Amino acid sequence: MTYTLPGSPVLLRHFTLDDCTVLEANPATMDSDRFSFFGLPVPGRMRRRVESGEAHPKPGEVHGLLVVEAEGVCIGFVSWHPQNYGPINAPTANFGIGLIPSARGKGYGTEAQKVLVDYLFQTTTVNRVEASTDVENIAEQRSLEKAGLLREGVVRGAHYREGRYNDMALYALTRPDYEQARAASSATKITTGFSASR
């Protein structure tokens, strides 16, 4: 089973063991992706999740992991988990993405995030999706903006990477914003006064 949007060059699908091989051969390193390197990966962790079925999200779940596929091959993954604000269980879906080095800079990340946002609003009851990235990661900030998310601000000192605490840029889209953009046009981008700049 796959999920995509009309005209998108990427699709989202469940993991296979072959996908694990691709991702294991392309781990994040300080040289390949300093914004995604948080230490050495646990060998076989993803394989165990795939074999147990844990890596396959069930419909409506506010946590999950899917493969990003382009041109018939695994080029990375997207993941999401619940983020609650307050004591009432009304989760936000906080998501992230990881692409293998050869897939970066081709627009696949933007497309995958567009498809994931649509998937989450179509298959879960979340009222908000959000993502954050290091304030130095200008490429991902632009990708999130192109995917239709709004920059809401900076979360100071929230992210530990490269031996220090770093600020994170927070992006989000609410269900009403999503529905308004979808009604206007599938290509509509909602904008604010914020932009991804240094």
Task: Please give the residue ranges for each predicted region.
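A beta-strand edge to alpha-helix "cap/lid" segment located at domain peripheries
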Residues: 122, 127-128
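Conserved acetyl-CoA-binding loop-helix of GNAT-fold acetyltransferases
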Residues: 105-119, 138-146
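Positions that flank functional sites
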Residues: 42, 136, 159
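Conserved catalytic-core motifs of GNAT/GCN5-like acyltransferases
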Residues: 82, 130-132, 150-167
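Amphipathic alpha-helical recognition patches that constitute DNA-binding helices
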Residues: 11, 22, 41, 94, ...
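GNAT-family acyltransferases
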Residues: 1-102, 165-198
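Active-site acidic-Proline motif in GNAT/NAT acetyltransferases
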Residues: 97-102, 106, 122, 135-136
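Conserved hydrophobic/aromatic "anchor" residues
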Residues: 15, 119-121, 149
